[in-house]
Amino acid sequence: VLLVAAIGIFIGASTSSGMMDIARHGILQPSHYSFADVMCVFLAVSATDVILLDIFNTLGMPTSTTVSMVFGLLGGSTALALKHILNEGLTYSQLINTDKALTVIFGIFLSVAIAFVVGLVVMWITRIVFTFNYKKHLRWTIAIYGGLSIALIFFFLMTTGFKNAPIVQNSTFGHFVQDHPVQLFVYTTIIAAIIVEILHLLRVNIFRLIILFGTFSLAMAFAGNDLVNFIGVPLAGLESFLDFTNHANGVSAEQYNMGVLAQPSTLPGVHLFLIGAGVIMTVAIWTSKKAQQVVQSTINLSSQNESEEVFSSSKVARTTVRNVLNFNSKVARYIPVSVQDWINGRFNKDNADQEEGVAFDLVRASVNLVLAGLLITIGTSFQLPLSTTYVAFMVAMGSSLADRAWGRETAVYRITGVITVVGGWFITAGAAFILAFLIATLNNVGGVFAMLGVILLIAFTMISNNRRFKKKQEQAENVDVLFRQMVNSRDKKEVWQLLLRHTQDTQVHLIAASREIFKGVTHGLTADNVRSVRTADSKLKDEREMWKRYRRKEILGMR
């Protein structure tokens, strides 16, 4: 899967026709900004994006490059716009594309709710059709499902992934795609359904095929849109520099107008930059432990299995679970018992066709990929700005809720996790605006020395985060093997013995920790050593959180 994703990213970056215009003139009005102004803004946005994304990656939290870039541009442009408003009497709307900015912001966050609801509804219907024992229900359904899925993915590739590729733009087939999208989808569905049925008769795993196609299409669309959009900021800065050096003719950087950014990009060798960015991201997929941790966070929140929860409980999550359970009980009164029993039977997991150790089965994986691709296609066709990160994450959360992956014991923890992640997105937006505003102001006031300081700040932040991440990884290597064996075991006697051993180890650890904490407190009080007492207090808080995690694990083991 990683290999397919890497190929998709590389091809998506290679076939893109150039950077998106939002970095050049989507937020700011370049005709009112000088070369010095735009360089302050572009450096501020680049620094903000790197700092914020590295922080979120270190925390293992998914976030959006699109949101950080858009709000960074808005914050940096606003900082320089205030200078022009005070000095030249211009209005904010003359300096900032307020309508475009509001459209981008509204479209991004609206996609969050739509993706969650669509993922929930479609996954519920799909599970009703296939059940968890899906291999017994493929004879008459796999052709329709596989045909629709592959047709949607192919349509997604043609309209989004390869949309800007010269091969599609300058060919007869490309014109047919643009002029007859409905016919293309119908023909593709019929042909794909026939091919899928033949492959199924040949005992080919259709779900794996759909997953590989979906992974490729999403990766390629991300590289062709989000990646290009993201590196559009430094590329716009490079083009501004080249234009200034070639056409300034003695005009100072503070006086040289950057109206050229309102025109289409003419940066030479832009495809080489895009391919280079694709190669870097491809390497990062294989080697970056931070990226793997971000993916693992999403998998943990959507896992079908009961495992060690990363997030703790919260009052909001408990209230939400309580209200949902009350609502379900009221709705259940109006649904016949026979219908409820039939639906519950379709969601029976006793004989689930799921490989041991995986987070969820192939049915849900295919739904996540196909739906994410479809929603991005629809948004692109209507020219609505979307974040692939937000769409993919919320589809996964909606499908996991529909799949009853959030049980009574795990729902409060996972809802807390979703709230934390979504809240982090709003924090990304606010932090990007404020940080870019401050850095752009600093660049404008401090000049070259301030810009050098910003670059040093980026280096310091990344080094500090990497050290913190390595320490976190060392702590995470202490895997609770007994708990994993309890979760994966189907033998109740074996689970009971493992639970006894786990409880014994927990008590031994807590007694030893209590002894060390008590020694620290008594030493601090007798020797009047405040540092010793503070250290003991910190250890006590850590042990309390660890004890809570142990208790949750043992409650799960008792089930």
Protein language model regions, located:
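Cytosolic, long alpha-helical scaffolding segments
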Residues: 468-559
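Multi-pass alpha-helical transmembrane bundle typical of ion/small-solute transporters
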Residues: 1-493
